[in-house]
Amino acid sequence: MDSQVRQNYHRDCEAAVNRMINMELFASYSYTSMAFYFSRDDVALPGFAHFFKENSEEEREHADKLLTFQNSRGGRIFLQDIKKPERDEWGSGLDALQSSLQLEKNVNQALLDLHKIASDHTDPHMCDFLETHYLNEQVESIKKLGDFITNLSRMDAVKNKMAEYLFDKHTMGGKN
């Protein structure tokens, strides 16, 4: 049954929103994996664990916003299987941040692609929604991750575990 509230909402936009929901849930799932990896007793970096747990919750909120948007536009939600994260072991904090940066770049590209689909189908509501709730936030997240990676690299954190510990404690807010 078609929605009575649907107006100027192209089927391509609807399908792309469903794919974006899946990508946001995958990102949340990946960040959950990272969070609990860093809270393991043999890794024990609580600042990284907290940072990735917050990112997981943020990505889940992004998915929820898209689900709400889909319903408000009269679209239909078709959830897909959520892919397993690319790894179970995330290595050092630097390794995980590099994976996180790539994940955020992938999400950003998917959002830009979604914006293009909306623009191509003259959907100003979707364009405004993406610009208001997602695009700037993605750029800020990418910048923050890049800064973290630069600082950890500068401290040679892969070889210097004390640097990683201090970064976790002072930058990521880790408490024992």
From Swiss-Prot:
Q: Which UniProt keywords apply?
A: Iron, Iron storage, Metal-binding, Oxidoreductase
What residues does the Ferritin-like diiron domain cover?
A: 7-156
Report the temperature dependence from the record. Thermostable.
Q: Name one Pfam family in it.
A: Ferritin
Q: Name one GO molecular function term.
A: ferric iron binding
What's this protein's family per the entry? Belongs to the ferritin family.
How it assembles, according to the record, is: In liver, forms a heteromer consisting of middle and heavy subunits. In spleen, forms a homomer. The functional molecule forms a roughly spherical shell with a diameter of 12 nm and contains a central cavity into which the insoluble mineral iron core is deposited.
Q: What name does UniProt use for this protein?
A: Ferritin, middle subunit
